[in-house]
Structures are given as structure tokens and as C-alpha cells.
Regions:
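Active-site-proximal segment of zinc-dependent metalloprotease catalytic domains
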Residues: 1-151
């Protein structure tokens, strides 16, 4: 069920043939998951933390994953751990390399780094599918940032701001958010400016929307709603592009060169050809929108 859910959404659906998928059976002592005490009987030491957080034994998860991939291959492997619970929860753990080679930082490069996405069965198939899209496909595979925020968080912290620009941007991660503490990005300076200038994307609801990475100030996102904000609405164009790029980078290696026009040609199946019935004629350049439900942002570690 999880595998079919992963390939139910573009661009994963169109490029399913480029993926290898393995299932490793792991049986816990007792059924289900609960608070911290459940770590004692869960095969991966999994338990619920605060909000929607899930904590697990990453080292043990990786040891099970190495039954089907090598330790070296883990750098490019997304590991999904599905927990038997109807409770709505999910957390993705991302690792970035401590030593990075600046010579690899070219336009097509997509930084390596293992990922473990923990989430529950969520109680129904549609919620499960959307959770998988956000945690596993968005964070874990495409290295996308969260597009939701909480009003109480205020301005993005200096630590998170510089983590983005020093650690993540050189790896081409978080392509769907634009942190900027001083002023507001314009249609010419925002990270996805080329989509805003492309008339083929005029009906995709793209703009400069305020709020992201859990902060209402200092971070901007490309659409009001998407899988990376509210677990619905599909992946927006910058996110689809990031997914497309990482699929091809992993499938064809460093000799693969990204071509924007080839992406746009593929992406015709996802673009809207006419305005939606609820679209306003004049959308403000900066739009606010707070998250409706508590989420847990990805946990990033430098290894």
C-alpha cells in the first residue's frame, strides 16, 4: 500500500521505472505504538514525542536497511518506517555531509544524504497517502522545506537562516522556500522567479506567499497550499522541479544535465491551462496563511 501511494502522485508516477523499492519485514514484540514506554517493545524503539513527532532508533533502522542496500548506498536511500497506529504523526530525519566538496556544486548537483521518514498508518488510506507525500516524498526524497508556519514563531532565527544558506542551499535542498530576513523578495529576485516569468505557469497559483519553515516572518513559499504546507493540493511547480531533478540526478549520475525546457515539456501534464473558478483576478504579491494543524518539521543532522 505504501509503495502504490508513493507512485500515485507526479512526478513520481511518471518516473516510477527509475526507482528500486525494497520491503524489509520487521516485527515488534507487541502491536501498536504509544508514548515513550513503547520504545521498549518496538523493534525500532519508536515512540511518540511532542505534537506529531515520532522518535526512533535511526541506527537500528539503517542496519535493517543494509539488508538490501550497502552502507555507501544509504547516502542516496530513502528509508520509510510505517508504524501501526491510527494516530496522526510523522517525522523525517535528514542527514547532510559534514565535509562537502565545493567542486560538486554545479547546477545539476543534488546533495546526497540519507533520510528516514517515520509515520503512522493514520487511520485511513487518503490521510496515509498525504502523510507519505509530505514526509517521505517531500522531505525525505526531494529535500523540500516546510511551507507552513505558526504565528507565534515570529521571525526566522539567525541559526535557521544561516543553516539554510550555509548548509542546505549549496546542496540544492529546500528549493521550494525562500528565506529573506531583510525586505521582501520580488518577482525578479525570488528563487522561483523563472516560473513567475513563464506564461505557461500563469494559472498555477504561483506567487510570493509569506510564511514557511514554521516561521511567519522571513520565509516565503511559492503557493498558498501544497503537500508541503497542508498535506494536500499536490506538489507546486518548484517542488515538482526539485523532485524531477533528484530523480534524474540519482538515475543518471553527475553526467546528467538539467534542461528547464525538458522539464516544462514533461510538466505539461501537471500545469493548469485555465484559471480555477476561485482564482482572484488580482492576487496580492504577498499572502499570509497559517498552518491548520500541528506538524513536526524535519530533523536535520550534520554527520
Amino acid at each position: 500500500k505504501g509503495m502504490e501511494a508513493m507512485f500515485s502522485e507526479e512526478p513520481f508516477k511518471s518516473f516510477r521505472n527509475l526507482f528500486n523499492v525494497y520491503m524489509v519485514m520487521a516485527v515488534s514484540k507487541y502491536e501498536g505504538i504509544d508514548g515513550e514506554q513503547s520504545a521498549n517493545h518496538s523493534v525500532f524503539g519508536s515512540y511518540f514525542g511532542d505534537g506529531t513527532e515520532i522518535i526512533g532508533n535511526d541506527a537500528k533502522v539503517n542496519s535493517y536497511a543494509q539488508r538490501v542496500v550497502t552502507e555507501e548506498q544509504l547516502d542516496n536511500t530513502l528509508v520509510i518506517v510505517i508504524l501501526n497506529s491510527d494516530y496522526y504523526a510523522g517525522t523525517c530525519y535528514l542527514s547532510i555531509p559534514y565535509v562537502r566538496d565545493p567542486e560538486l556544486y554545479y547546477d545539476g548537483y543534488f546533495g546526497d544524504g540519507p533520510a528516514i521518514a517515520y509515520f503512522t498508518t493514520c487511520g485511513d488510506e487518503d490521510t496515509f497517502r498525504r502523510m507519505l507525500m509530505h514526509e517521505a516524498c517531500g522531505h525525505g526524497f526531494a529535500k523540500l522545506g516546510d511551507e507552513y508556519f505558526y504565528s507565534g514563531n515570529g521571525m526566522i532565527t539567525n541559526r535557521d537562516y544561516w543553516t539554510y544558506y550555509y548548509d542546505l542551499e549549496p546542496l540544492n535542498w529546500y528549493k521550494n522556500v525562500h528565506p529573506q530576513m531583510d525586505g521582501t523578495p520580488t518577482a525578479e529576485t525570488v528563487k522561483w522567479s523563472y516560473f513567475l516569468a513563464d506564461e505557461r505557469y500563469q494559472y498555477d497559483g504561483l506567487g510570493i506567499f509569506k510564511g514557511g519553515l514554521t516561521y511567519p516572518e522571513g520565509v516565503y513559499r511559492p503557493t498558498d497550499y501544497s503537500f508541503m504546507r497542508s498535506n494536500n493540493g499536490g506538489f507546486n511547480a518548484p517542488s515538482r522541479e526539485a523532485i524531477y531533478r533528484r530523480i534524474h540526478y540519482l538515475a543518471y549520475g553527475i553526467d546528467w544535465e538539467y534542461d528547464y525546457e525538458k522539464f516544462v515539456e514533461y510538466d505539461a501534464i501537471n500545469r493548469k491551462s485555465a484559471p480555477a473558478a476561485t482564482t482572484l483576478e488580482a492576487m496580492p504579491s504577498v499572502v499570509y496563511g497559517e498552518a491548520e494543524m500541528m506538524h513536526c518539521p524535519p530533523k536535520i543532522t550534520i554527520r
